[in-house]
Amino acid sequence: MKKLFLTLVAGLCISTGLFANGDVRQDDKKQNYANSKFVWTQNYVVEGANAAMAPTTEEIVTTCLSKDGKPLRWVRKNDIYKYGKFTGTSTLETALYNMAVDEMINNYEKDGTLRTGLYWGGVWTRDVSYSSLLSLAYMCPDKVRNSLEVKIDRMGRIIQDTGTGGSWPCSSDRVVWALSAWNIYLATGDMEWLEKAYPIITKSLACDDMVVYNPQTGLYRGESSFIDWREQSYPTWAQPADIYLSECLGTNAAFYGVLKVTADMASVLGYKKEAKMYAQKAEALKQAINDKFWVEEDGYYASYWYGRQNMIRTQHSETLGESFCVLFGIADEERAAKVISSMHVGEFGPPIFSPQIVSQGNYHNNGVWPYVTSFWGKAAAQVENEKAVMHALACNVRTASLYATNYENYTFNTGNPYTTLMNSPNMLWGLSGFMGLYHRTFFGFEFSKEGLSLKPFVPSVLAGTRKLEAFPYRSMLLDITVSGSGNEIASCKVDGKDADAFIPADWTGKHTIEIVMKGEHKPSSINMVGYIAMPEAPVVQMNAGKLQWKPIANASKYEVLKDGKVVAETTSCEQQVAEDGEYLVRAVSAKGVHSFVSEPLRVYTDALVQQVNVDKWLDNQLGEQVKVKVAVPASGWYVVDWEYANGNGEVEQRNHCANRQLYIDGKNKETMVFPQRGLDAWNAYGWSSPVKVYLKKGTHQVALRYLEKNININIDLDKAHVKSLRITRLP
């Protein structure tokens, strides 16, 4: 079998000119990684009828063609060696690193910022921030800083990228800017930058505390970080206001990381009171994440909570959020190890989330994003899971080799980058993830304000000697050599003397670090489950006192939920209901895979619902904008929401989401959001985010006020039309 395989590779290489003489060199026979889809040996990657290899350390060739049928090849074109010279254990290993550095330089814009990808110009807050965390904060800190500075608005707040319903707060992950800002400081020690970044971060967090934070759950609202294509990850019925209400693992993990580094910033800057406050907030959020998202029977954190009046937890795992829970220390040691070994993985890598939504195209859904794979690989190294680290490295090597570039994404169950809805080569966070995973595993980079620690995690099959020469760190040039494999250091010499594998931040000049690994790894595993399909969500109607829906393919039963809790199971497609409440139905497959719940169906007698005509405009004038008197017939819990239109932009574009504070009898209750519902769609009325309040019997004043912290990302255009107020008494 091995002979046949090598003959096939040799034949492929002769036919495509990958080897000058058609000979498979001895080192190419060493197999690094193989599964049923692809093989990675020392100097080539083979998948089906395609192969790729590196003739030199400055060139990668492949039999794969571009999407339009043209040959693919990478050849170095930039001065990459001023960022250090990497020498791996094979020509391909070295060439792939060189390609990532080369593509990093390709993304340098004339204005000193970083381009997002070959096809996408401009700076995106989350793209540059996550790229910074992966490697760019120390590879090109000046470029990252310049990029962060263009994502500050004139009010001194972080700019949220374009997103659902008019950007912030439906999308709320802009705070990852702070993680990048802190990592620039760790890499450079630049106090001037820290002093500039800190007030921008704290002002943004203050707005989020009022508009995004939910004190009832202790979590932050807004769609999953970077997973911002609505129907790609949410049920199709979800309106922008529903997506704002969702509480997501990745976004909350990011907020935790931000609160933690903001406390660290405050401490460095001498703000002891603020440092304590942010540290306490971080600890409270950490507890809330563990309480609300952890699913013991699955061994990982759930992706998000969603709904309207009542919230439901999804069954999904979500790779970026899971990875952050490990990397940021949200998960304790036991949970962290369990997350990496339990979350869903496929042969081409970990999916963005799992299970998949059959009716949706490939992008976030049914997609692998190499930068997320890199975060997952780093998290795997942290918990010392050799199989996961090896799988992450192999999947990144496979795609970069076969397509001779660092793509943004590819299809989860085929590995094809050409079958996703949108993609770009030379992608900033793809290339930064590739470099970052090399740095974390082969050299063990860990930056702190005290200096650079080296804690390599080299898989056994990748044992060998690797060098990173003339690597710039602060006022130093470092020559680093790591030999062997394993997760523990056997010996370390710094400048020829036995020492800890640590370089103090205040050193200057040239230094040599030589590390030999012990060659040991503990047993590890991953959960290779492949493609799992969700059943479709039922579409439910109320008819003669019964909930009714059409049969769902592959459903073995249906669960009926009232006010967020399962109250019945049935194999039929109807359910009698006799009580007032909010009803939902979900399909469950024979393997226990849940669909999304159906759109929440309000079943209330007329006596429980009041609707008052308003016909008012929300505009840019700070202060009270709407005031309505309502008579409440009995004391109890009520849901307040507003019928509104916002035609300032498409659901998926622009930044005109309107946010206002709900005041009842002069007391600030909560933020209510009025997202965009379609460009010029001023007759497309829907409902704002709801607020649950306790009201006593009698007359109350219900008002909407526009406060400075409500101001949207656009600043200049912040309006909506309010048609009516609805108050629903909960039974």
Go through each PLM region and give its residues.
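Extended glycan-interaction surfaces of carbohydrate-active proteins
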Residues: 43, 47, 82-121, 143-168, ...
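Bacterial N-terminal signal peptides
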Residues: 7-16
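Pro/Thr/Ser/Gly-rich low-complexity, intrinsically disordered linker/stalk tracts
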Residues: 525-554, 592-606
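Non-catalytic C-terminal accessory modules of carbohydrate-active enzymes
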Residues: 24-25, 346, 382-543
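Beta-strand-rich modules
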Residues: 576-594
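Inter-helical turn/loop segments and adjacent helix faces that build the functional surface
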Residues: 184-196, 262-277
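Aromatic-rich carbohydrate-recognition surfaces in CAZymes
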Residues: 45-46, 122-128, 135-223, 248-256, ...
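Extracytoplasmic
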Residues: 579-580, 598-731
